[in-house]
């Protein structure tokens, strides 16, 4: 029996307030309005950015359904939707691509003005929500909300992918892999023979390592305080692994000693202001490029010596790896299917959706790289 045009009741992980576990609830998911798509989520990854909302480092309205790295199948579409149809395999996009704003029209931009990353409204573009639970409206998360059996997204925030794609693997292209890999090949444009330093070896950081290797970097220094992550980093392309706890001097001084005048490219994939400054200071004084990928904590400010930039260094940010989402995601999935890169080493745990709290515990204890929840 078709569910198109009807409210769907399904299971979702609702976060009622910060610093509390998820609660598996029955929620009502309204039908898609014009230019919206309702998706049956089949696999979703657990990302550190979701945890930032739980801890309060990323401020969002509550109650909320988190999750933004996923893959699924279109259940129904609203009026005017032409890019996808029921039955299509898709990946929701937390960075939409409207094709009309200045960022979409620029060859240099990718952060579409239709995104809900900065405004943090927790609502669909029309200012309303499609989720209710126990009579209460539930907020969306950055236009995706994938910790639920069904979600609704705007047509600008969904990409059709290959019908043969394994969703429990390619869901990582919805955030972690694309964010890291793209920061190296798309944002920094790492050059062959260069030296790179990657601060933080979670799923995104390891994807940066993979991107640096693919770009032809000759030396990739992987940095983390958890030495258990070093074997995987080396497997994926790191040439050196450094634990800052093994040194009494600041990490940027260690890197300067290792490289002479600093690295060509550094990547901060943690989200701490002190490591952002350290990553900048570890770059070559004249032409080093440092890229921030880690989500900065709310309300924190950064202080640094402006001479670090005056001498010629470049400091830049990267959201979703600099990719234009609707254009890039189908191609990245196709590249994965053609074995141009691997995703399997990033996935350390596959859990049933109802074990979402266990998945977050693994993340916080540093025991997982990516946990994928399956429905």
From Swiss-Prot:
Annotated positions of the N-acetylserine modification: 2
Gene Ontology MF annotations: all-trans-retinol dehydrogenase (NAD+) activity; zinc ion binding
UniProt cofactor note: Binds 2 Zn(2+) ions per subunit.
GO cellular component: cytosol
Binding-site residues for Zn(2+) 1, renumbered to this chain: 47, 68, 175
Catalyses which reaction(s): a primary alcohol + NAD(+) = an aldehyde + NADH + H(+); a secondary alcohol + NAD(+) = a ketone + NADH + H(+)
Protein family (similarity comment): Belongs to the zinc-containing alcohol dehydrogenase family. Class-I subfamily.
Name of the featured protein: Alcohol dehydrogenase 1
Species in which this protein is naturally found: Apteryx australis
């Amino acid at each position: 029996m078709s569910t198109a045009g009807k409210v769907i009741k399904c299971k979702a992980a609702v976060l009622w307030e910060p610093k509390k576990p998820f609660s598996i609830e029955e929620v009502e998911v309204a039908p898609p309005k014009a230019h919206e798509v309702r998706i049956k989520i089949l696999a979703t990854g657990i990302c550190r950015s979701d945890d930032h909302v739980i801890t309060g480092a990323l401020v969002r309205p509550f109650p909320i359904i988190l999750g933004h790295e996923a893959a699924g199948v279109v259940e129904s579409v609203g009026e005017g939707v032409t890019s996808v149809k029921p039955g299509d395999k898709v990946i929701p996009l937390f960075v939409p691509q409207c094709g009309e704003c200045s960022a979409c029209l620029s060859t240099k931009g990718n952060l579409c003005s239709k995104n809900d990353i900065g405004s943090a409204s927790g609502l669909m573009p029309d200012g309303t929500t499609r989720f209710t639970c126990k009579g209460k409206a539930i907020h969306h998360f950055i236009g995706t909300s994938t910790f639920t059996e069904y979600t609704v997204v705007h047509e600008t925030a969904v990409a059709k992918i290959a019908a043969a794609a394994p969703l429990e693997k390619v869901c990582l292209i919805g955030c972690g892999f694309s964010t890291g890999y793209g920061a190296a090949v798309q944002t920094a444009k790492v050059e062959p023979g260069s030296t790179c330093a990657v601060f933080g070896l979670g799923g995104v950081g390891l994807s940066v390592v993979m991107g640096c290797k693919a770009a032809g970097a000759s030396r990739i220094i992987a940095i983390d305080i958890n030495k258990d992550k070093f074997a995987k980093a080396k497997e994926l392309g790191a040439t050196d692994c450094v634990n800052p706890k093994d040194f009494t001097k600041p990490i940027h001084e260690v890197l300067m000693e290792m490289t002479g005048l600093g690295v060509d490219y550094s990547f901060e994939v943690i989200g701490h202001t002190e490591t952002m400054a350290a990553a900048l200071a570890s770059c070559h004084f004249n032409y080093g490029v440092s890229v921030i990928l880690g989500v900065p904590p709310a309300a924190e400010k950064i202080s640094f010596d402006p001479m670090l930039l005056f001498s010629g260094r470049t400091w830049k940010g990267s959201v979703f790896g600099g990719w234009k989402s609707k254009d890039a995601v189908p191609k990245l999935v196709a590249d994965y299917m053609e074995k141009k890169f691997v995703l399997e080493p990033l996935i350390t745990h596959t859990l049933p959706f109802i074990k979402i709290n266990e998945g977050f515990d693994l993340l916080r204890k540093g025991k997982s790289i990516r946990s994928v929840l399956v429905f």
